[in-house]
Amino acid sequence: MSLMFDVDAAVYPFPAKPIRLSSDEKLAYRTKIKRLLQERDAVMVAHYYTDPDIQALAEETGGCVADSLEMARFGSQHSAATLLVAGVRFMGETAKILSPEKTILMPTLQAECSLDLGCPIDEFSRFCDAHPDRTVVVYANTSAAVKARADWVVTSSIAVELIEHLDSLGEKIIWAPDRHLGQYVQRQTSADILCWQSACIVHDEFKTQALQRMKLLYPEAAVLVHPESPQAIVDLADAVGSTSQLIQAAQTLPHRQMIVATDRGIFYKMQQACPDKELLEAPTAGEGATCRSCAHCPWMAMNGLKAIADGLEQGGSEHEILINDALREGALIPLNRMLTFAKDLKLKVRGNA
């Protein structure tokens, strides 16, 4: 356990929610964004957890809606000179790591991730230095600097297989930053894992008793859970997986109702995949002042239409992701190591949050 970061005591600097736009304002910004994408030779990639309006716009303009790794891979394979990344900052960094020749813009560089914030590089480096006999495995939801300090980068879709592989080689593991996912992987593999103690603010808020009550109200519903959730929530699941895996589970499970324990932004693509199914939000700590996220990442909410238009129009230091070459090359090594491992096992690597 890390004694250097207490996720329960952390007070995150949440941003103000974007100002609600009128229908006319939305139409004007959508038109402007489409024009700016063409003028900049840009393509827009949006994460599953952004608002439905943003995901729809990405699809309409030839971009993609995906998990963090697939967003970066789509951008690296696209001919556009510029990527507009609607997500949080580590996603923009991952795109830059895979596409150093492209201009990577974001609606705002202030869109953070509690997992990233909860694993600052200086403290994490000291933690790793204190355990030099352990292989360092970090989740994709980390800064470029933390990735560069690691031996492996991993996504939730391949985490169990990778840790099983390392355990078979007799390696002991440092896992960072998500404590819940680390504990889930440890239970699945029985590997020797030392977990950094950070958590996703959205998944950390799902509540066991409230979910049990909801299951009583909807006894025929399947429960879909992201493994960043606490163990007690995972234990109630019919399916556990990454964002892409949960969408697939919603398609393949026979249930007509789905209680979904992840960010509600996923409902846009999940409903596309399962138009005949009813999707229900899993309960969090409450609404308003009684919960911190209320099942929606406050930083993802910063990716509004106005912010996207500003990012494309203004560019510059307030919107462009820049990573020095040495750091980028250092972060690329463990990322490529994971991709090679997955290719050798013929596994489909999907991202996380």
Curated annotation (Swiss-Prot):
Stored InterPro entries: NadA, NadA_sf, Quinolinate_synth_A_type1
Cofactor(s), by name: [4Fe-4S] cluster
GO molecular function annotation: 4 iron, 4 sulfur cluster binding; metal ion binding; quinolinate synthetase A activity
UniProt keyword Iron, yes or no: yes
Cofactor note: Binds 1 [4Fe-4S] cluster per subunit.
GO cellular component: cytosol
Enzyme's top EC category: transferase
UniProt-annotated location(s): Cytoplasm
Pfam family, one: NadA
Keyword Cytoplasm attached: yes
Catalytic activity, EC: 2.5.1.72
Transmembrane portions of the chain: none
Residues annotated for iminosuccinate binding in this entry: 47, 68, 139-141, 156, 226-228, 243
Keywords attached to this entry: 4Fe-4S, Cytoplasm, Iron, Iron-sulfur, Metal-binding, Pyridine nucleotide biosynthesis, Transferase
Catalysed reactions, as listed in the record: iminosuccinate + dihydroxyacetone phosphate = quinolinate + phosphate + 2 H2O + H(+)
Binding site for [4Fe-4S] cluster: 113, 200, 297
Entry's Gene Ontology BP terms: 'de novo' NAD biosynthetic process from L-aspartate
Stated family: Belongs to the quinolinate synthase family. Type 1 subfamily.
Stated role: Catalyzes the condensation of iminoaspartate with dihydroxyacetone phosphate to form quinolinate.
Protein name: Quinolinate synthase
Lineage of source species: Bacteria, Pseudomonadati, Pseudomonadota, Gammaproteobacteria, Enterobacterales
Gene encoding the protein: nadA
